[in-house]
Amino acid sequence: IITRLFILGALIALLPAGVAAQQLDARQRNAETVVADGLAQLPAATPAVFNEVMGELAATGSAGVEMIAGMLTPADKGKNATLEYALNGITAYATAPGNEALCADVRKGLVRAIERCADNANRAFLFSQLQLCSAAEDAAWILPYLDDSYLADYAIRALISTPGTEPVLLAEARKEGLAAERKRALAYAFAEKRMTQAEPLLLGWLGGADARTAEQIYN
């Protein structure tokens, strides 16, 4: 009970003054209470408890995901195991067959959490979760993170693993004045996604390309 109350207090502290989630679940709990109850039961004792808790947490949507992500502390303090367990479980639950209706809101929560997070290691963890559930509509949002030295690799992996990102990748590749690093990232994405339609663009980059860029293009 003490743990639950501590978590609930921390969640309330994260909310703007006077703001509370209004939607109630079947047990008449708001999102803050659902999250506090769920976190207090983790790690789950059985698969049945895991599925029940993750189902309830996933049903809180973007609000719940943002609350849990907002409790992450700088990764070097090593106090994030339960929170990461919860976020990973929510993502897994929302992407499981039959739970697709939950995925969009979970994805939205991860996007907002990444935008608000200031710790690189935590941003990377959140991005790794987004990579598991991102949709084509997220491609334009993900693309600028190719310029983030810490998250660039996570961003390109997300663009590769997400179905339907091909138009955004091609549009980016057609821009003038792309840096060599951006060309290498795009060439890698084209290869991983087997995008033969990008071959004319890649061949056009070979003229004047540095050795690393040329090697990536040929790969």
Language-model regions: role of each:
Residues 1-3:
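N-terminal secretory signal peptides that target proteins for export/translocation
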Residues 37-93, 121, 158, 215, ...:
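Alpha-helical, heptad-rich or low-complexity scaffold/stalk segments
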Residues 17-21:
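Sec/Tat signal peptide C-region and signal peptidase I cleavage site
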Residues 77-94, 153-185, 211-219:
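Long amphipathic alpha-helical scaffold regions
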Residues 24-41, 62-74, 96-115, 124, ...:
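Amphipathic alpha-helical scaffolding segments comprising HEAT/armadillo-like alpha-solenoid repeats
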Residues 5-16:
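Bacterial N-terminal signal peptides
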Residues 45-50, 64, 78-85, 118-125, ...:
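Positions within the helices of HEAT/ARM-like alpha-solenoid repeats
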Residues 25, 56-59, 85-93, 126-132, ...:
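Core register positions within helices of long alpha-helical scaffolds
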